[in-house]
Design a protein with these regions (language model features):
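Short, hydrophobic beta-strand segments
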Residues: 62-69, 553-558
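Active-site and substrate-binding clefts of carbohydrate-active enzymes
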Residues: 16, 93-152, 161-164, 170-186, ...
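Short proline/glycine- and polar residue-rich coil/turn motifs
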Residues: 52-59, 543-550
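Metal-dependent polysaccharide deacetylase catalytic core of the NodB/CE4 family, i.e.
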Residues: 161-261, 307-327, 364, 406
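Catalytic domains of cell-wall/extracellular-matrix polysaccharide-remodeling enzymes
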Residues: 239-295, 366-387
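Structural beta-strand segments of beta-rich domains
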Residues: 19-23, 512-516
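Terminal connector regions
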Residues: 70-92, 557-586
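Asparagine-centered strand-capping/turn motif at beta-strand->loop junctions
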Residues: 27-29, 518-522
């Protein structure tokens, strides 16, 4: 026999004392006329109860209740052994609404090998696939755009440059995607590409209309704070941020002034890079980054200044509530109730954030799709936006874009070097056997890149390859990818070695003078130092050898000469020294 099902909702989440609460009850699967007990509950105690009548086979009943005292309540409907509850909050309307910044990090690493073949379709699949069927017919990235367009709520999106880069790659070139037994080519004419265009156009329009804020980031999602501390890759990270901003501007038409710091991994050594690139604000973690600066419960909601940067600290508990708990909704009733719980939790912070900002920051997609796509988590997202829109109209909450914040409360002098997890362990040591191999490959690639650029100067292709090598996603313990890191590291090393091996050196002797000729068969000019050591002296000659040409140097004598080809700054040996020994003829 089919079980009776009950759905219960109210017209809003937040009410003033004494305001009418419209209650809707839907009962399905009735075989006979039944009583429905409608109860108002506070702290597990029944406040009021009334009995309604339900008529088979299904009934939709509307009723009204009033609650005069402020607080959090549940409204319960019970029938035929089944019960559902939905939470509401009775709260006095504030003089000024609670300012709220909601940040979603919509991101995919560039799932591409140096061969040009994608080893993962996720940037595309999570946009166009009906992963939340039967409720929605698209993936999370497009769903976000459609829902914000529908409810017009101010939301801040980090559409990561690596995600945008892949969308743009598809539109410009088409993509090759690796399968189990074949490689699929998806051309720009594919019908699914229309959904990618819709996502781009919707986000772009919403940004230009001032509905959403778009954050930029580094191009390939490096663990920037860790990398700059461990490897001091200042030039690479400066380049990555510049290129990330270019991608955001080219694909969306947005000149972003805020950025998402990958893995929220901060280091003071990043500060000048961000400031020099025109970044005005970032979001960090309220637990691990604010840390010892927390003085009271209002500290996390204050706006801080750090050099050029305005810093918002996310409410970690509120963010994690959605990421790891409320997202487990298994039906529509739970999705609605969980959205209400989030709004209520938000409003419970109003007394601590009266002149500040409550910030939530979390992944935009993972809480809906991992371990498998959950249609009711997607429904939860829509309910959150619906109730936020309602709370804004009623004057309780004001969702805002971070860039409109002009004031700050405190200067923060020092911010710990750490991630949203409080350490780098997730990327370096949780699976140390594999991760240590990855970091060894990364170190080798960084060393070769440094030597190459010291000799040949900045190289876009090489920097892109190194950025792909260092993407944090492929070092994450649960998703380590030896093939991706290994192939891109090899790409860096082999290009650098090909270039360095294209430098030649030859000798000729004329009138007891040794002529040393350095040739350059690489595509870029080479800056070098030629070290010449004799038993008596050591001399260095700085030389620039243009691409496809050679430069001669003449020295007097050549007995026991050691000749070294060196990089110009660090004097790194480009190859083993060459020793010339002149045999002394005995008479």
């Amino acid at each position: 026999m089919k079980a009776v099902s009950i759905e219960l909702t109210t017209n809003k989440v937040l009410y003033e004392p004494g305001e009418d609460i419209t209650v809707n009850v839907m009962v399905r699967g009735l075989m006979s006329r039944e009583d429905i007990e409608l109860t108002v509950i506070k702290d597990s105690q029944e406040i009021t109860k009334r009995v309604l009548q339900a008529i088979p086979p299904e009934s939709e009943i509307m009723d009204y209740v009033r609650i005069n005292d402020v607080g959090t309540y549940e409204i319960s409907a019970r029938c035929c052994g089944s019960e559902v509850r939905t939470p509401v909050m009775i709260i006095n309307r504030p003089e000024t609404p609670l300012r709220f910044v909601l940040v979603f990090h919509n991101h995919q690493p560039i799932h591409k090998y140096p061969s040009g073949i994608y080893h993962g379709p996720w940037a595309f699949q999570h946009t166009w696939s009906p992963e939340f069927y039967p409720i929605y017919d698209v993936g999370p990235y497009l769903l976000h755009a459609r829902l914000v367009n529908k409810y017009r709520v101010s939301v801040t999106y980090n559409l990561s440059p690596s995600l945008l880069w892949q969308w743009d790659d598809l539109l410009r070139n088409g993509v090759f995607i690796e399968g189990a037994d074949h490689v699929e080519y998806i051309g720009p004419w594919d019908s699914r590409v229309g959904l990618i265009k819709e996502a781009i156009n919707t986000y772009s329009r919403l940004a230009n209309e001032g509905v959403i804020e778009v954050l930029t980031s580094f191009l390939a999602h490096p663990i920037a704070g860790y990398l700059i501390e461990k490897f001091e890759v200042y030039d690479l990270l400066r380049w990555e941020l510049s290129r990330g901003k270019e991608v955001t501007r080219r694909v969306l038409g947005v000149n972003a002034v805020g950025m998402w710091l990958p893995e929220l991994y901060f280091s003071e050594k990043l500060r000048n890079i961000l400031c020099d690139e025109g970044i005005r604000f970032i979001v960090l973690d309220g637990v691990y980054h604010l840390g010892e600066a927390i003085k009271d419960r209002s500290s996390i909601y204050r706006v801080y200044r750090h050099d050029c940067l305005t810093i918002l600290f996310r409410d970690t508990a509120l963010s994690d509530l959605l990421s790891f708990q409320l997202n487990k909704a298994s039906n529509a009733q739970e999705a609605d109730a969980n959205a209400r719980r989030l709004i209520i939790e938000l409003m419970m912070r109003i007394n601590y954030a009266r002149d500040g900002v409550v910030t939530m920051a979390l992944d935009g997609e993972n809480w809906m799709i991992l371990p498998t796509p959950n249609p009711y988590a997607a429904l939860l997202l829509e309910k959150i936006m619906m109730y936020l829109s309602q709370a804004k109209s009623d004057g309780y909450v004001m969702p805002i874009r971070p860039s409109i914040i002009k004031e700050f409360h405190d200067e923060i002098k020092e911010i710990p070097t750490t991630s949203w997890l409080g350490s780098p362990a997730k990327w370096i040591s949780e699976r140390a056997d594999i991760q240590s191999r990855l970091w060894s490959m990364a170190q080798a690639a960084i060393s070769k890149w440094r030597l190459y650029e010291e000799v040949f100067g900045e190289d876009e292709e090489l920097r892109m390859s190194l950025a792909m090598t260092l993407d944090s996603d492929y070092y994450w313990a649960e998703f380590v990818n030896v093939n991706h890191v290994g192939e891109w590291a090899h790409s860096v090393i082999s290009r650098a070695e090909d270039a360095l091996n294209s430098l030649g050196i030859r000798f000729s002797l004329e009138n007891d003078h040794l002529e040393i000729t350095v040739s350059n068969n690489w595509v870029k000019d080479a800056n070098l130092v030629l070290g010449i050591e004799t038993p008596e002296t050591y001399l260095e000659y700085s030389i620039k050898v243009q691409s496809g040409s050679s430069e001669p140097i003449r020295i007097n004598g050549f007995n026991n000469v050691v000749i070294s080809l060196l990089s110009p700054k660090t004097r790194t040996q480009i190859r083993k020294p060459i020793k010339i020994v002149r045999e002394v003829t005995k008479h």
